[in-house]
């Protein structure tokens, strides 16, 4: 699940008030001693192996073991470096991370260093026994991907009959063990008409949060062109999402949808509502795309990337210490300078809170600095060349 298909794991997890994966987020340092931004979230693909065959899997994961995965010793050495870049939340993702034999050992090790850990399995491998192991290892939240309100739609998308029922059973085991969970849903043309039904399912299950993901056409998802909704439809969906979040106490978040943060500010201004944590929670304190800015992805072989959808090699932890990659990667430097983005994103007045999806721009154009292709907004500011 948010494993290979959602490389951000818990979708910049659980930014809600009180307990949860972002509990204490207010206390995260904003910058490091050298002036680099602190890392808030690390999605770590501890294995690429997965027992499902999801149509939108960016990793095109399969069940067999992958060569070159970090050893237990290498993994622990990597974990030792995480506190040097701030106080990041560690998202154990995959593939399905539960297919890694030493998973609980690694989570316990990270928890022992004071790191907050969340887990992103697809849910089908969760049992009563390992749900207790998940809790005892120190996992603060699990995210489970559900892409339809029933087995028919979900199983077709996941590529394995019975996946829906297995995930439902896994969620029940998490509940029995007292492990908090959220639901992640990828927006496609097929499931969009059922979004209210999916939300109702989230409510009935007792999910702490519902995160929707805008599809990034990489990996197997590159073959899903017909499932990608248009820029105009995304605008409509995100405006609906803004309104819908007011109807529930459940935490709702749009992920891989940086333009939501522009829409949120536009709508809040229309309503005369200050964009503050009291009114919008952590959404008021973050930006749309955190890739290379407050978030990064580490692959199963140790390659550091801005995100799981964007396979830019920023360095490998086997060759260079992770904190050095975080501080000095040229790709990260570029991402941290939004006025250098190409097209309208570079001169948009919302580039500090949105930034566009670098991965979608790269997929569509071949440039990681390209403008967000699924955005209808036309900036009020003119490009610098036009202002001369």
Curated annotation (Swiss-Prot):
Q: Which SUPFAM superfamilies match?
A: Radical SAM enzymes (SSF102114)
Segments for region (Disordered): 1-29
Q: Which cofactor does it need?
A: [4Fe-4S] cluster
Q: Which InterPro entries match?
A: 4Fe4S-binding_SPASM_dom, Aldolase_TIM, Cmo-like_SPASM_containing, Elp3/MiaA/NifB-like_rSAM, PqqE-like, Radical_SAM_PqqE_MftC-like, rSAM, rSAM_AhbD_hemeb
Pathway assigned in UniProt: Porphyrin-containing compound metabolism; protoheme biosynthesis
- Database matches in PROSITE patterns: RADICAL_SAM
- Mind listing the GO molecular function terms for this protein? 4 iron, 4 sulfur cluster binding; metal ion binding; oxidoreductase activity
Q: What class of enzyme is it?
A: oxidoreductase
Protein family per UniProt: Belongs to the radical SAM superfamily.
Q: Which PANTHER family match?
A: RADICAL SAM DOMAIN PROTEIN (PTHR11228), TUNGSTEN-CONTAINING ALDEHYDE FERREDOXIN OXIDOREDUCTASE COFACTOR MODIFYING PROTEIN (PTHR11228:SF34)
Protein name (Swiss-Prot/TrEMBL): AdoMet-dependent heme synthase
Species lineage, top-down? Bacteria, Pseudomonadati, Thermodesulfobacteriota, Desulfovibrionia, Desulfovibrionales
């Amino acid at each position: 699940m948010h494993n290979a298909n959602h490389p951000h794991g818990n979708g910049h997890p659980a930014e809600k008030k009180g307990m949860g994966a972002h509990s204490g987020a207010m206390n995260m340092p904003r910058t490091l001693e050298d002036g680099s931004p602190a890392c808030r979230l690390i999605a770590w693909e501890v294995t690429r192996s997965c027992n499902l065959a999801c149509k939108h899997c960016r990793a095109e994961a399969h069940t067999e073991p992958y060569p070159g995965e970090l050893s237990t010793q290498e993994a622990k050495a990597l974990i030792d470096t995480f506190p040097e870049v701030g106080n990041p939340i560690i998202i154990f993702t995959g593939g399905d991370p539960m297919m890694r034999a030493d998973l609980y050992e690694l989570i316990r090790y990270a928890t022992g260093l004071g790191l907050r850990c969340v887990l992103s399995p697809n849910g089908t491998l969760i049992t009563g026994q390992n749900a207790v192991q998940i809790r005892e290892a120190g996992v603060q939240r699990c995210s489970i991907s559900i892409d339809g309100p029933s087995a028919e739609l979900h199983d077709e998308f996941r590529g394995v009959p019975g996946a829906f029922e297995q995930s439902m059973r896994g969620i029940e085991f998490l509940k029995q063990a007292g492990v908090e969970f959220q639901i992640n849903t990828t927006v496609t043309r097929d499931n969009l008409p059922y979004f209210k039904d999916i939300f109702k399912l989230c409510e009935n299950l007792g999910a702490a949060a519902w995160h929707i993901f805008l599809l990034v056409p990489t990996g197997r998802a590159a073959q899903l062109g017909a499932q990608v909704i248009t820029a105009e439809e995304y605008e409509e969906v995100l405006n609906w999402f803004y309104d819908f979040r007011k109807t529930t106490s459940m935490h709702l978040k749009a992920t891989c949808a940086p333009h939501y943060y522009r829409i949120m500010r536009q709508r809040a201004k229309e309503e005369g509502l200050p964009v503050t944590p009291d009114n919008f929670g952590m959404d008021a304190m973050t930006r749309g795309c955190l890739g290379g800015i407050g978030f990064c992805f580490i692959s199963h072989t140790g390659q550091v990337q801005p995100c799981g959808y964007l396979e830019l090699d920023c360095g490998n932890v086997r060759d260079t210490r992770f904190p050095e990659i975080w501080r000095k990667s040229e790709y990260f430097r570029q991402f941290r300078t939004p006025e250098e983005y190409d097209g309208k994103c570079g001169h948009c007045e919302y580039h500090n809170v949105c930034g566009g999806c670098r991965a979608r721009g790269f997929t569509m154009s071949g440039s990681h600095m390209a403008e967000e292709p699924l955005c209808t907004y036309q900036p009020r500011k003119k490009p610098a060349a036009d202002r001369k």
